[in-house]
Structure formats: C-alpha cells, structure tokens
Amino acid sequence: MLNFYGHEFSSRLLLGTAQYPSPEILRKVIDKSGTEIVTVSLRRETAGGKHSGQFWQFLKELNVTILPNTAGCYTIKEAVTTAQLARDLFKTPWIKLEVIGNPDTLQPNIFALVEAAQILNNEGFQIFAYTTDDLIVAEKLLEVGCRVIMPWCAPIGSAKGPRDTDGLRSIRAYLPDLTLVIDAGIGRPSHATIAMELGYDAILLNTAVAKSGDPVLMAEAFSKAVNAGYMAYKAGILEARDVAVPSTPIIGKAVFS
C-alpha cells in the first residue's frame, strides 16, 4: 500500500485536474485510472468566480482525496499564504508545495522551497515538496520536515520523460525510507514504467492524460504502466550486461566428434 502521512492508498497514480475537455471526461478518467488522489490549484478555485464553487462541489462528489497545491507561486510569501488559504478551503493539512524560479522552465526555486517548507512544517502542514532531481536538495527538504518529496523527471508539461535516471536513482538509494513521487515531465506510459522501475513510490501527472487524444484510454494505459513498473521493481530487475550470456543450459548437449 502507498502511504502518505499515515494514510494508505491502493493506487500509485496521482492525477492533476487541469486542462481536461470537460468535467465529465475528468470524472471518467478518475474512474478508469483508479486514482484516489487528485491535485487542485487554489488559484483555480479562487480565480474562477462562480464556476470555482461548482468545480469544488464536483470534486467532492468524486469521493477522492484532494491534494491542494501552490502552483504559480514565485516567492516564499506567496507559497506560504496560498498554503494557508488552501488549508482553510479544503480542510486538509496536506499541501503540494511549489515555488517556481523560472517562468519559462517552471524549474523550482530550491532555496525558497526549502525555506517555505520549514515555515509550513512549523505550522503543522504535511508537505509534498515539488523539487528537482538533486539529492542534496532532497536531503535538505527531509531535514526541514518533508516526508514526501516529489522530484521532477523533466520540466512540467515537456513530456520528455526521465532525463537523469542516475540522479533519480541516487535519491532513491540514499533515501530508502522516504516516500518519493515523480512529478512533472512524464509524457507516455513507458516513461512512468521507467520511473517506477527506479524504485519510486508513485507518479503524479496531468498533461499527458488531459491533452491526449483519448484521455480516458490514456488514463487506463498509465494506470497499467505504473503498476507494471512497480511490480518489476519489487520482483527484481535483471542488471544490464556488456556481453551476451546464454539462457539455454548446455548440460546434456550432444557432443559431436
């Protein structure tokens, strides 16, 4: 079972709720994927006027766990204030903490991220920290109280898939007991499988499903891909070799003179 701050879940696929063609498509995606956790931007809820209340009511009817996020925040103050508002609105101590450093790459500002995480941890938040694939940053986030860390595998929405598998693998190796979720950059189901084969606990994605030609079918594909990668990691994956190794035994082989 997947465990986030003492709560257990069966699905290892988390989904964003933006960019879907319609709420009904989103409903079908959640049902088909089996996901139990969806992320929601507070800015969407507060900026949408009367429609924001309708969307919040729609989410409550889905019977899934809501993970609010601080998407679009560029400063510590913005992120902390947004998290506080999200806690009041969604009635949860969970927050997916994002502090963006560059508007083009959407790369996290790791310095502001660590400081904001420390502030929010002191206020009792349970933080899901969106960060890069840098081990030292992950260790610093752990030091300030983050128990779920979400390294990217590529920039948000880029669909490039895991670019630095060595970096992602080192985070898993050095932090074996920490819950790790790949967040951002996943473009195809095979990317999700690769990430899970590295030993990660879950995948969070949005664009790859929402903007596909058939979001419902793609959601099912990702669900199966995540499970396949997780099962492969647990089973023990064969190490790559530089030379051929025969798979057929030679015992009993006929000898011709």
UniProtKB/Swiss-Prot annotation:
> Does this UniProt record's set of keywords contain Magnesium?
no
Q: Which residues form the active site?
A: K96 (schiff-base intermediate with dxp)
Q: What is catalyzed by this enzyme?
A: [ThiS sulfur-carrier protein]-C-terminal-Gly-aminoethanethioate + 2-iminoacetate + 1-deoxy-D-xylulose 5-phosphate = [ThiS sulfur-carrier protein]-C-terminal Gly-Gly + 2-[(2R,5Z)-2-carboxy-4-methylthiazol-5(2H)-ylidene]ethyl phosphate + 2 H2O + H(+)
Q: Which GO terms describe its molecular function?
A: thiazole synthase activity
What Enzyme Commission number does this protein have?
2.8.1.10
Write out the GO cellular component annotations. Answer: cytoplasm
Which compartments does it reside in? Cytoplasm
Which pathway does the database say it acts in? Answer: Cofactor biosynthesis; thiamine diphosphate biosynthesis
Keyword annotations for this protein, in alphabetical order, are:
Cytoplasm, Schiff base, Thiamine biosynthesis, Transferase
Name the InterPro entries for this protein.
Answer: Aldolase_TIM, Thiazole_synthase_ThiG, ThiG
Q: Which domain of life is it from?
A: Bacteria
User: What biological-process GO terms show up in the record?
Assistant: thiamine diphosphate biosynthetic process
According to its UniProt record, this protein's enzyme class is: transferase
Primary subcellular site in the record, as a coarse category? cytoplasm
Q: What does this protein do?
A: Catalyzes the rearrangement of 1-deoxy-D-xylulose 5-phosphate (DXP) to produce the thiazole phosphate moiety of thiamine. Sulfur is provided by the thiocarboxylate moiety of the carrier protein ThiS. In vitro, sulfur can be provided by H(2)S.
HAMAP family attached here? Answer: ThiG
Assembly state and interactors?
Homotetramer. Forms heterodimers with either ThiH or ThiS.
Q: What is this protein called?
A: Thiazole synthase
Origin organism is Bartonella bacilliformis (strain ATCC 35685 / KC583 / Herrer 020/F12,63)
What's the encoding gene here? Answer: thiG
